[in-house]
Amino acid sequence: MHEMSLMESVIEIVCETARQNGATRVKSVRLDVGVLSHVNPDALIFCYEAVRHGTVADSATLEINRIAGEGWCLDCGKTVALEERFGACPDCGRHRVQMTAGDELKIRDMEVI
């Protein structure tokens, strides 16, 4: 389960950022997770519960925002919705689509005290 190492990194970044800004506690964390990122949100939540204990994020809430897949078709020049990572353009049917959203995992923001 790669979600555990991902969440360990998220907690490390969150705690270090809180310390650098003089915060004593993290109140909430919001993540953006792309639907095409191969990251399971339920597994992330499970791992979050496991790795936050004993840190300044011990009682922080976690919110996960799902980011839809989107791409730019190099053939028809349109921005299109993507349902799969290497799918065809839904407009022209060609497979020259450059992904522009939906594969990210990033910390959107956090609230500290």
From Swiss-Prot:
Does the UniProt entry include the keyword Zinc?
yes
What keywords were assigned to this record? Metal-binding, Nickel, Zinc
One Gene Ontology BP term is: protein maturation
Q: Which InterPro entries match?
A: Hydgase_Ni_incorp_HypA/HybF_CS (IPR020538), HypA/HybF (IPR000688)
Enumerate the residues binding Ni(2+): 2
Instruction: Give this protein's Gene Ontology molecular function annotations.
Output: nickel cation binding; zinc ion binding
Keyword Metal-binding assigned to the entry: answer is yes
Question: Binding residues for Zn(2+), per the UniProt record?
Answer: 73, 76, 89, 92
Q: What Gene3D superfamilies does UniProt report for this protein, alphabetically?
A: 3.30.2320.80
Q: Which domain of life is it from?
A: Bacteria
Function in brief: Involved in the maturation of [NiFe] hydrogenases. Required for nickel insertion into the metal center of the hydrogenase.
Classification via PANTHER family:
HYDROGENASE MATURATION FACTOR HYPA
Membership in a protein family:
Belongs to the HypA/HybF family.
- Protein's name in the database: Hydrogenase maturation factor HypA
Query: What is the phylogenetic placement of the source species in the record?
Result: Bacteria, Pseudomonadati, Pseudomonadota, Alphaproteobacteria, Hyphomicrobiales
